[in-house]
Amino acid sequence: ILGRWWRYKWITFHPSLTADSIWRQGDDINLYGSGTPVQQWMTYRDAETYRSIVRKGPLFPLNSLMYHGIVSAENAYYGLEKVQTDSDFADQVWSYFATGTQLQELYITPSMLNKVKWDTLAKAAKWSKENASVLVDTHWIGGDPTALAVYGWASWSKDKAILGLRNPSDKPQAYYLDLAKDFEIPTGDVAQFSLKAVYGSNKTVPVEYKNATVITLQPLETLVFEAVPVN
């Protein structure tokens, strides 16, 4: 792990130095945008990632970032030291694992989690492990969280793809779902999919995706889908 103060010259002038993950930059925890402190924390986390990593180095592998993990702890701050609703916690957990990060951090006080939260965490972590070979391809899709635009993460392999989307606004927003573009599918490969909701439910997302379409995300909605190619 290289922490906050990584420098490109280390890699340039020290070829023996390797790093599995680097810090996404910014504050450990902060708030931005709409909703509860948990929702604002998620927006800040992703806005910082977009500003410091995606825009400056669009080819940098997102699975090699240290995001500062899942936070629900007595020693946290900005409202994250308080018990979260089950739905807020689930949004935080699934959005975190959808980033594909290989450095999976938990900043958690166990007594603040009930059975529902533990089950959510276990399910998402297991899903992440089972799909590691796909999630290694994770890249950014959509817009800028700082502008409260719909954004997310996509990863693709020939046998399976994964799509995560989030609306950071407190208003419904449309998203142009073009999976050939979002998955960055090579020319000639299948671009039609059967979509299975892994987290969340949205009736505007087609179960059988054939062509680009406009979907609508509800305020502060987080979605995760698996996509299986259809010949």
Residue ranges: model-predicted function:
Residues 2-201, 216-224:
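Active-site-proximal substrate-binding groove within the catalytic cores of carbohydrate-active enzymes
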Residues 204-231:
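C-terminal beta-strand-rich structural cap/linker in extracellular carbohydrate-active enzymes
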